[in-house]
From Swiss-Prot:
Protein name (Swiss-Prot/TrEMBL): ATP synthase gamma chain
HAMAP family, sorted: ATP_synth_gamma_bact (MF_00815)
Principal location class: membrane
Compartments where found: Cell membrane
Membrane topology (UniProt): Peripheral membrane protein
Length: 279
């Protein structure tokens, strides 16, 4: 009888878990729809903007040769909440594979900062902003840009790269690296294959144009990366909670079957005892 009560207690616990994971799945679904709409609204502008900037970048005369020992400021876009599958760990794996001892990291989101604080011997963190969903807009990204550039100048780094998650579909998201500064020709050719090596005439001059578009490009890339990463986070959490709910339901079915068998055996034993007493 005691074991039957224990099984019943476990069943109640699993039922409570199902309610929680199912509620979290629905919340994640609502956020997914919100960020997908936002992402779709800005995608056309971003593609055309990257194409225009890319056409300018590939027209640069005599691009500077990249030194082999470039020191990088990594902008790590992670979540501030957990329970989102491999969303954060995949970005950590990608950055670990490309991180060098002199590199620094500016964290946008709390989760991956705690990972690097615990697992890195280099103390790479130079900035942290706990991004909330309601904060993600173009104006806010401009204030983030100022803080990132302050860190970039203070530590005398050579380039800035984003670590974000690219959205393929609701089931597939892929961690990506994207060089934001200085402009990289190959990056733009990868982003948009139609970008060509056609030479352009610049007015007033090439350097002035580059100086004008650099902060604008940074803001656009930052905003786009945050929106897309939040979209991927929502999709990943939705999938994780759906899997957790399914696993909990499977476990509940197992406990229910076990409970029914024990109850049946208990009732059978009681009937046998009653019949035996009558005899």
């Amino acid at each position: 009888m005691a074991f039957i009560q224990e099984i019943k207690r476990r069943m109640n616990t699993v039922k409570s878990t199902i309610k929680i994971t199912n509620a979290m799945k629905m919340v994640s679904r609502a956020k997914f729809i919100k960020f997908k709409k936002q992402f779709q609204e800005i995608s056309l502008f971003f593609n055309e903007f990257y194409k225009a900037v890319g056409q300018v970048v590939v027209s640069l005369k005599e691009p500077k040769k990249k030194p082999d020992n470039q020191k990088t400021l990594w902008i790590m876009m992670s979540s501030s909440l957990g329970l989102c599958g491999q969303h954060n760990s995949n970005m950590n794996k990608l950055l670990k594979a490309n991180f060098k001892a002199d590199d620094k990291i500016f964290f946008l989101g709390r989760k991956n900062q705690s990972f690097w604080n615990k697992n890195s011997q280099y103390n790479p963190a130079v900035g942290f902003i706990d991004i909330q969903d309601r904060d993600i807009n173009f104006d806010y990204c401009q204030t983030i840009f100022d803080q990132i550039m302050d860190a970039f100048k203070e530590f005398k780094l050579d380039r800035i790269c984003m670590v974000y998650t690219k959205f393929k579909n609701s089931l597939i998201q892929q961690s990506q690296l994207f060089q934001v500064f200085p402009f990289d020709v190959e990056t733009f050719k990868t982003l948009n294959p139609v970008v060509t090596d056609q030479q352009l005439d610049f007015e007033p001059d090439q350097a002035t144009i580059i100086n004008l578009i650099t902060p604008q490009f940074f803001d656009v890339a930052l905003y786009g990366g945050l929106v897309e990463t939040k979209l991927c986070e929502s999709a990943s959490r939705q999938n994780a909670m759906e899997a957790a709910t399914k696993n909990a339901k499977d476990l509940l079915d197992k406990y229910t079957l076990q409970f029914n068998k024990l109850r049946q055996n208990s009732i059978t034993e009681e009937i046998i005892e009653v019949i035996g007493g009558m005899n």
